[in-house]
Amino acid sequence: VENGEVVLIENNELRSFKPFPVRKVRPCVFEYIYFARPDSILNGKTAYEHRKNLGKELAEENDIEADIIVPVPDSGNAAALGFAQHLGKNFEHGLIRNHYVGRTFIEPSQQIRSLGVKLKLNANQTTIKDKKIILIDDSLVRGTTSHKIVKMLYDAGAKEVHVKIACPE
């Protein structure tokens, strides 16, 4: 379905029409870094490729020594992989996501967002214990989720946790 297109399906018939004036496409940056499925095509490349490239660019600015690169699942996966590959570092799933909990950053209250993080993520202790970690996330909206994740990693035995954001602007 294209921008401004209406697709109508009735009586086993598919009709498409564009009742609105054609306007220049102005995508939201969050389509590239968060909302789009990794296999969505955006400007001729998959969202996965865009996100992985952001991780590579972030790695070019890195000045921190770490044992492992850990993504905030699932939104930070591709960027963390690009980051790790560019630096030749180990990519590890130091956080395990419960896929039955939805997106936490769009919840209406801080209390619900905090509870959502606790239900959504668990630290993978055997992977992170005594490790210096670079934690990669796609973006930073409020910072409350990142704060809770960092605490979770330290509580699970991480030696150091450094947070890097793939799309900070």
Name each model-derived stretch.
Residues V1-E169:
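PRPP-associated nucleotide enzymes
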